[in-house]
Amino acid sequence: ITAIEIAAAKHPDGTPIVPEVCIFFENELMRGNRTTKINAENFNAFRSFNYPPLAKAGIHIRYNEHLIRRPDPSRPMKPHYLFDTNVVVLTLFPGIQESIINSVLHVPGLKAVVLKTFGSGNAPQKEWFIRQLKEASERGIVIVNITQCQSGAVEMGRYETGLQLLQAGV
C-alpha cells in the first residue's frame, strides 16, 4: 500500500512529489538507477549504496525533497529505446589471463568496455594489460573504469595502477 501512496502523492499544485523511477522496498524509496539487488532470498534485497533514500516510510512517509529530481518543463522527456549492445562489462580478478583480455578487446564491433576494477580504480600492473587497453583505446573503443566495491568511487590518480589506466586512455 505504501508504494501506491508514494506513486499517487502530489504537491498542492498537482505535480507528483516523486516524479522519477524508483524502487520502494523495506520502507525505503530508492532512486531506480542507483539501486542494486543485493540478496535473492531476504527481504532486505535492494540497496542504494551511493545515494541516500528519497523517502522513508513508517507511520508517516518522510520525503527527502532536496534529493528528489524535478523535471525541467522546458525540456520534454526523451526516452531512449535503442541501446548499443556492443558494450561489454569486464570484471577484473586476480590472475586474469592475457588471452581473456585479448578476446574481449577484439570482439568484432566492440564500442565500449566497462572495466570493473579493484578498490578505488586499481587493476593489474602487467605490461600486456596496459598495452592492450591502450591499443583498444587507440582503436576508438571507449573504456570506463568503475569500482567493484558496493560503495565509494574510482579515483584514477590516487595510486600508480590507476594512473597507468588513465595514461592508457581509460
Which stretches of residues belong to each language-model region?
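A glycine- and small-aliphatic-rich helix-loop capping segment at beta-alpha/alpha-beta transitions
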Residues: T2-K10, T36-A45, G162-Q167
